C-alpha cells in the first residue's frame, strides 16, 4: 500500500510498504513550522515504532528531499534520488526498476509533470516492476500520479487502488 499527501507551497510526503495513514500529515506539520525534510525524517524515526517497516519519501516545495527505506520492508526494496525527486519501491524485481524510473524522469524534463510521472511509472513496470523473491512477476496493484500547485488544490489526482494492472 501507499499513502501520498501533498500540500501546495509546502511539499509532498509518500509512505508505502507498511503504511501509517497519519504519517504524511504528521510529517507536513513540522515542515509547516520550518523543519527541513531531514529533520522531519529524524523526528519520524524516533516517534514511529514501526519505522523500519516503512518507506517514506519527503520532497519540499524547494525540492529538498529526504528518503527512508526501512530494513524490514519486503525485498527487493530501495530508493534512488535525483535533482528534486525520489523513486522508491518495494517487492521489486531489482534495483534496475528504480534505475529505469530515475532515467525516465530525468530524460523527460521538457514534458509536462503529469506525463513525466506517468512515463516514470511505465518505465518501472517495463523494467520488471514488482516480483516475488524468486523472480516471479507480480502485477502492480496500486499507483498514483498527483500534482499540486502553490494553492491548496490539486492539478492532477489519478489513483488506482487494488487493481491487477494499476500502471496499464
What does each model-found stretch correspond to?
Residues 1-168:
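N-terminal nucleophile
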Amino acid at each position: 500500500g501507499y499513502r501520498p499527501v501533498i500540500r501546495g507551497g509546502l511539499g509532498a510526503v509518500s509512505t508505502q510498504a507498511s503504511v501509517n495513514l497519519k504519517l504524511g500529515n504528521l510529517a507536513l506539520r513540522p515542515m509547516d513550522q520550518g523543519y527541513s525534510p531531514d529533520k522531519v525524517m529524524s523526528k519520524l524515526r524516533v516517534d514511529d515504532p514501526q519505522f523500519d517497516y516503512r518507506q517514506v519519501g519527503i520532497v519540499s516545495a524547494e525540492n529538498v528531499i529526504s528518503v527512508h527505506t526501512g530494513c524490514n520492508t519486503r525485498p527487493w526494496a530501495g530508493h534512488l534520488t535525483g535533482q528534486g525527486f525520489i523513486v522508491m519501491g518495494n517487492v521489486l524485481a531489482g534495483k534496475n526498476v528504480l534505475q529505469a524510473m530515475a532515467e525516465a524522469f530525468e530524460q523527460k524534463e521538457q514534458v509536462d509533470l503529469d506525463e513525466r510521472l506517468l512515463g516514470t511509472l511505465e518505465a518501472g513496470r517495463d523494467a520488471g516492476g514488482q516480483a516475488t523473491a524468486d523472480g516471479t512477476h507480480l502485477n502492480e496493484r496500486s499507483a498514483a500520479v498527483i500534482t499540486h500547485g502553490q494553492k491548496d488544490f490539486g492539478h492532477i489526482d489519478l489513483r488506482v487502488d487494488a487493481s491487477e494492472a494499476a500502471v496499464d
